[in-house]
Amino acid sequence: DYLIVGAGLFGAVAAYRAARSGKKALVIDRRPHTGGNAYCEEREGIRVHKYGAHIFHTSNREVWEFVNRFVEFNNYINSPVANYKGKLYNLPFNMNTFYAMWGVTTPAQAAEMIDRQRHEAGISEPRNLEEQAISLVGIDIYERLVKGYTEKQWGRDATQLPAFIIKRLPVRFTFDNNYFNDRWQGIPIGGYNKLVDGLLAGVEVRCDTDFFADRTHWESLCDRIVFTGRIDEYYDFRLGELEYRSLRFEHETLDTPNYQGVAVMNFTEREIPYTRIIEHKHFEPGGDQPRTIITREYPAPYEHGAEPYYPVNDQRNTKLYESYKALADRDRKVIFGGRLGE
């Protein structure tokens, strides 16, 4: 009944729901494993997030109860730290951040500092991302914690990026380092692989299988396709190619039990080529292994053959995506979903 292209979280949930409703589903994935970008592998007794950090969080009770049918979650709270030229700041922007930056100790002092810088900038109609960010949080936070990180992420100067990329920058006037506001968060005990394996139990799965290598064959097998890859690739780029950004992950095993003391540290100066370092053992309790594994995350331009990780969010890309979405809305054969499909 269903061919599901992509064995990540969206594809796995689609397969589970199809099976539960009495439909037959076949899941294919060109990678040698299931789980998509949430896939983990174990090294040195440490569960490594192979494609970057993934922290599950939701305020939807139905979603939380659903995933807990398959796996329990630990009590990990995402509290990343930003490193700017060797000085550390808590994220998201909160009273700990403002104390480290200005020495202020009360919410009123912090709010006054931010408001003063916003008004000194005198930006009423931001023309680009830089002006938008400064108009929201002032020059100090922008220069130290937003500018370099954002420019590395998008591969462009902040003055060349559209203002609408940043709708808001969350500012908290409490000493709360919890990055998310959601009711529930955590990491699956046993890893995301355990969650995905539970979702795919009893479903036929074929890895190392490329949909586009024999598209006619795969399309002939099913009534509907659930597609979690690139929407423009599905339609043979007939309207043009969407622009994506890629990532490169550099994994390293170190002869120290604790490298940075936190799971995620962002490096916000432009001169450091990576955006963050992940120390995987801190995602789970314990962490008493004699060695540690870190991953440096490097943003990169997308080139054919590389992995597209996220779309470039500018006016051209958004307009082109809307054209592809209009095609999809008229297409009764396919359902798009997932990070790339949507």
Regions found by a protein language model. Name each.
Residues 85-89, 95-224, 228, 235:
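Active-site/ligand-binding neighborhood in enzyme catalytic cores
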Residues 6, 77, 205-210, 338:
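Short loop/edge segments at beta-strand edges and connector loops
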Residues 9-10, 32-34, 96, 151, ...:
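Short, solvent-exposed loop/turn segments at secondary-structure junctions
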Residues 44-120:
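Dinucleotide-binding Rossmann-like beta1-alpha1 core, especially the glycine-rich loop
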Residues 19-44:
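Glycine-rich FAD pyrophosphate-binding loop
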Residues 2-27:
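N-terminal Rossmann-like FAD-binding beta1-loop-alpha1 element of flavoenzymes
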Residues 212-322, 327:
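Mid-domain catalytic core of redox enzymes
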Residues 328-342:
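Short FAD-binding loop at a beta-strand-to-alpha-helix junction that anchors the flavin cofactor
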